[in-house]
């Protein structure tokens, strides 16, 4: 596996590389938003009912779609937020890490905002596969109405296969994601162009006054419809989250050259079709195609939704890894499915949780029409969070005056709040799902941070300063521990105090190695740490040294590889005569700990689910010694 420097944020050095990144971005970054035409316009028409939508309403709806895409995606994400990066990386937690690193007047507020945004994204990662795959497979009902009862079983099988292959990695097939999705966008554009001529009046949708007029005249229905209109921009947050994988210029080029034109043309075509054939309101996307093309389009749509689902699953894996490295969650097992790309990862526990959630949603709601109301809440919430974090970013990082930041971001913030309000109206129709998912994840992150803090406070009462300990053991006395040859490395989170495992080793084994290394692992609030800054070695005495290893929150925390680098640069030790000492704590709940009993139990359960540090840090298992202790928390 290559070093982290090989996985710095993507940059194109020549035209072929730029085109490759741009096509790749079309598949990964825009897969989600590219499947929205399957259901978004249909859902916007649904409140009017068959025959209840007039010409002005159709034109107004399409105008709303076009200007929502312009305001939210083009202006906020493509032109603005893509510039707000953390050493080339984007995403909610990446932006939060940068704000915490630079300093903010509201660290607690920013922390909870960032955690909420991340939690809402996980809700999106469950809803997107369920909704998009169902909406694609439902096209079979137009091909053969007799297949109606098979839509859900077929969708479930596709989801099962999708999650089953995650452990094998997607590197071999991911090269096809971009070309397949490019074909999908071209077909959508062609279908739109073919139907715009059905009623050229649809072109007046480019006039924003039609969108404003629709909202003014539609009243409550117009407000309700905004929740469905927002479905057209679901997936926009992926632009920001995938910034490090493809680079700003490639993502922008893909949007302006392919994605935005294709989406605009398709929505215009759907609108023109409904103007000329009002009965097409039932499924305007698939009814754009002649009967002979329906089956190929269902197959292509299914492929596109699988790619979109894969993108959010990969995004969820990446986000949880960031949360682990930033200390928001315990260390879950992380498997690397590529020898060359550290971004291709697989988290077995997260995969199982996502699969369970997706299947539960599909079986609970049964159709894309029933599930669609659940979708908008998580996306609008995540986008509002991005705007809040962006406001603090431009103030702290770019030095914008408060009035300038307000003038730029307040209109977008107000627009997103309106969309959020419209989506909250659908809470009882399924909008509660992402709220429950986000609430669960926030509770877990908060419990973990609070539990770790309480645990550190309890252990700190028994800590012995490292300098004091060294002075004691280096005194010559009959009670001094026996010196044995070799090197011992003691892993600790607090390098100024004596590791508990070192104290237990002397207490039970009465020995001290010839060379003792106190090793601490720090996660920097940057995505990647250069190899030249990976470690610092400080000699404390003839027998003790302090080794600090530093990793970014996107780095693979491979301690064995880092130690090999140290050895090349003069840190003298032999791996086969080195023992790694790790402490294993057995946590016992204490009603007087300061945590509620339910939170005590949740924290202990999360700690028990964490992967063994030996495996997580890639330590040589045959050189690891674990000593346990009970801690009442």
Curated annotation (Swiss-Prot):
Single GO MF annotation: symporter activity
Q: Where are the transmembrane segments?
A: 18-38, 61-81, 107-127, 143-163, 173-193, 211-231, 255-275, 287-307, 345-365, 371-391, 402-422, 427-447
Q: What is its main location?
A: membrane
Cell compartment(s), UniProt: Cell inner membrane
The catalysed reaction is: K(+)(in) + H(+)(in) = K(+)(out) + H(+)(out)
Pfam families linked to this entry: K_trans (PF02705), K_trans_C (PF22776)
The alphabetical list of record keywords is: Cell inner membrane, Cell membrane, Ion transport, Membrane, Plasmid, Potassium, Potassium transport, Symport, Transmembrane, Transmembrane helix, Transport
Bilayer disposition of the protein: Multi-pass membrane protein
- State the disulfide connectivity: none
Instruction: Write down the InterPro entries for this protein, in alphabetical order.
Output: K+_transporter (IPR003855), K_trans_C (IPR053952), K_trans_N (IPR053951), Kup (IPR023051)
Record's Gene Ontology CC terms?
plasma membrane
**Which HAMAP family does this UniProt record tie to the protein?**
Kup
Q: What does this protein do?
A: Transport of potassium into the cell. Likely operates as a K(+):H(+) symporter.
Similarity section:
Belongs to the HAK/KUP transporter (TC 2.A.72) family.
PANTHER family assigned to the protein according to its UniProt record, in alphabetical order:
LOW AFFINITY POTASSIUM TRANSPORT SYSTEM PROTEIN KUP, OSMOTIC STRESS POTASSIUM TRANSPORTER
Would you tell me the protein name for this molecule? Probable potassium transport system protein Kup 2
At the highest ranks, the source species' classification is: Bacteria, Pseudomonadati, Pseudomonadota, Alphaproteobacteria, Hyphomicrobiales
